Amino acid sequence: PYITWNGALIVYEGATSDHGDNRPDLSGKLKAITAGHGDALAYYKDQTYRASTFNDLVKAQYDTFNTPYPKVDPDYYLTHPVYMLLVITVNNDKRYIYPYGDQLTFYRNSPYAMDTIRHGESKQAGIKTLIAKMGLDGIPTYAFGDGTNDLPMLEYVDHAIAMGNGITAAKDRAEYITSKNTENGIIQGLQHFNLLP
């Protein structure tokens, strides 16, 4: 089982959860705003992602995370489930948040983009759903986080672990601060809690 795309996709016993799949009408509206302002929109399915266009902002976003560039498919959301959107913008946050903030949650996790999921979804909600589906109420919970999208999750779990490269707010919520993600921080954190030898 796993949770991905900020809690929007939960896979358990080969089935996906009832979370996710941003409404196509909202994806279309966001795509229109991005096109009008020189921004871009990326659509995330399970292991696949596509972009509405390719421009310098898209290049900068994916270069920041050393991630392959998405293929361009402006209408991908019409024929595939989309669990997370990435609004690729530097200065236009309010143009997206104001009209759609009651339906979508926006997390700015890089200088170039905002992770975008359905309102009410989060990694925290995903953890709660998976625990309930698996009948594991009461088990100790651990989570690693570094960005704004991780804050609700870090507040929820029993043992919050912040990455060394994380934002101050994540570190403030952490029981333990591990090394950076590029310095085996996950392994170090698991070893600290005796979850790995």
Place the predicted regions along the sequence by residue.
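Alpha-helical substrate-recognition element adjacent to the catalytic core
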Residues: P1-G14, G20-P24
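Short hydrophobic/aromatic-enriched beta-strand-loop microsegments
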Residues: P1-W5, Q61-Y62, F106-N109, A160-G164, ...
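Short, polar loop motifs at secondary-structure junctions
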Residues: G7, T89-D93, G164-T168
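A short acidic, helix-capping loop that chelates divalent metal ions and anchors anionic groups
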Residues: I10-G14, D115, A170
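Short loop segments at secondary-structure junctions
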Residues: E13-T16, V90-N92
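Short acidic-hydrophobic, aromatic-tinged amphipathic segments that line or gate anion-handling sites
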Residues: G20-D21, P70-V72, I177-K180
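Conserved acidic, metal-coordinating active-site core of Asp-based
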Residues: G28-A32, G36-F144, T148-M153
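Mg2+-dependent phosphoryl-transfer enzymes with acidic/Ser/Thr/Gly-rich catalytic loops
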Residues: T116-P197
